[in-house]
Design a protein with these regions (language model features):
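A composition/biophysics-driven feature that prefers long, compositionally simple stretches
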Residues: 1-182
Length: 182
């Protein structure tokens, strides 16, 4: 029985960090976050090369996202919610589509994501906006953390910076802070 490249990658991820490591890293971030705050961390997206082609091979997940989840895939979102007691950790992933997987590669399942990250509250990515709207309308959120770090001013903003700016527009009364120093 042969092992696929995807299964090999999963085995490597399991070796590099255990669920306990990722859980303790997330807990350290939650401990440093202000009360009544959330952290939203995007893994990143694929980039267009041309009108009908994506750059699938050089796309990399945000390193801080990987550090907190152990998942190195695009189009995922980690949400840490410190507006409720106890604090909640949620992960949003893409739903598998057999046709798309044939062309672009296999997606991580909910079970695999839970096994690697230790996060048990996992939803599909299309639930993210409604979940954020629910959090923002039902909880007292004063601060939202995003990974807005840029090494130099001339660096192009990554997807987290773009999403942080969208969040500022959608929720102008909520302070947006950089997650990086935590």
């Amino acid at each position: 029985m042969s092992v696929t490249c995807f299964e090999q990658a999963l085995q490597i991820m399991r070796i590099r960090g255990s669920k306990m490591d990722f859980e303790s890293r997330r807990q350290r971030i939650l401990d440093k976050m202000e009360d009544n705050s959330i952290a939203i961390l995007y893994s990143g997206i694929e980039h267009h090369v041309s009108a009908d082609e994506y750059d699938l091979f050089t796309a990399q997940a945000n390193r801080n996202f990987f550090y907190l989840t152990g998942l190195r895939r695009d189009n995922m979102v980690l949400v840490l919610d410190k507006c409720v007691e106890p604090a909640k950790t949620m992960l949003f992933i893409e739903e598998a589509d057999p046709t798309m997987e044939r062309w672009y590669g296999r997606k991580v399942t909910m079970e695999e994501a839970e096994e690697i990250s230790g996060i048990d509250e996992i939803e599909y990515i299309y639930e993210l906006e409604s979940t954020l709207d629910r959090i923002m309308t039902r909880e007292d959120v004063y601060t939202a953390y995003f990974d807005t770090y840029r090494h130099q001013k001339v660096d192009l903003p990554d997807y987290n910076v773009v999403k942080a700016n969208e969040f500022k527009t959608d929720y102008p009364g909520v302070a947006v802070k950089n997650l990086f120093p935590l």
